[in-house]
């Protein structure tokens, strides 16, 4: 016992008794002066922090990014040069479920990566699918509301989901992926990851290239059917956490092959689709993926709350050689993610150890709640403004990226005008074999249980525009699963 550390209060005072409250007699009331009890209860009341608005349920691990290819002609980013090895953190998640949700629900999976580079943190905050449900961020809150609980019933609403999707044809690509085999991976290790957005590379010559990031699982793709997923949930609600944690604990380190698609800057003027549209992919035949490295996860967190729940990923975190694009949803996420962290974790969330850069940090931000770095980070207390004459941090012109080409008049443009929301879905549907199509149809039918007929018919019209077989297959699956028969097609459906 003499070798064990002494329990103390948070102020450092030794605690003589950690078993009994301070009372007036053995049966008496609690004394208000029992500051040890008050402190213990007060801390318990504050153990939980607000959960993420989306991607609340997550699992994570540490590892490394090793660059084996050569893309130095496209980017000056040091972490992407041949032979570079960068420590990193990955967090996988579901989108809709709360922290207590089951892991094996059909949902898009988050695939968020934080690279601790010598030039600052680089965050790539993607999903396990290359597209998403929206192309304009103005609709993101509305879409997420359909994935969360109904304000009156406090239940998930299939009606809300399909009503929104049927009124938003740009969602069809992601809906098709979600309802396919890819919508329910067996584990985080058996799915791909994608940056999803279009980013950019820029090199020392000031040349810009558009880029998409892909992370292809080396463990192979493994998926569950709805019935298999339900069986797993009946045994454990933490299947993803268990599989990831114990694989790493047992030395079975998961790996992903890192690939990039690269598009010359001026190619955006000749592609038949908008390369910055989050609902679209770049055809591999036009822009073949180039293998550049390997992502490996090899260390579990020592404390889940400190290192995974406190982790803050933001697309705004980039490094020299990597830039943004006119992708509208990316532009909004640059603001919204960092802002969400300031609400959830506090003004100085980047000073939480798991979020701290591994390189020197100097800036003129000061004060604020939970300021733990001594007021300012300039190295000189007299240099608390800029410009100054006291050797405070100075700007680095060499980090300036080349100009980004933009044009056009300011307006609220209809994002559906000029966009074909069916051609790429048709190409994807054509890749499915008969078994995959059958499961797609039955998954959609299962998800439509209880949805009003006019909403179903409106969605079936979208499926028909992709391919007649798509619409017919879902209609037959609806009849088999629910006895669904359309009496008439409503005005709304038309």
UniProtKB/Swiss-Prot annotation:
GO terms for molecular function: catalase activity; heme binding; metal ion binding. Residues 1-23 have a biased composition (Polar residues). Its EC number is 1.11.1.6. Keywords: Heme, Hydrogen peroxide, Iron, Metal-binding, Oxidoreductase, Periplasm, Peroxidase. Residues 1-25 are annotated as: Disordered. SMART domains: Catalase (SM01060). GO terms for cellular component: cytoplasm; periplasmic space. GO terms for biological process: hydrogen peroxide catabolic process; response to hydrogen peroxide. Heme binds at residue 337. Its cofactor is heme. PROSITE patterns: CATALASE_1, CATALASE_3. PANTHER family: CATALASE. Decomposes hydrogen peroxide into water and oxygen; serves to protect cells from the toxic effects of hydrogen peroxide. Belongs to the catalase family. This is Catalase A. It comes from Rhizobium meliloti (strain 1021) (Ensifer meliloti).
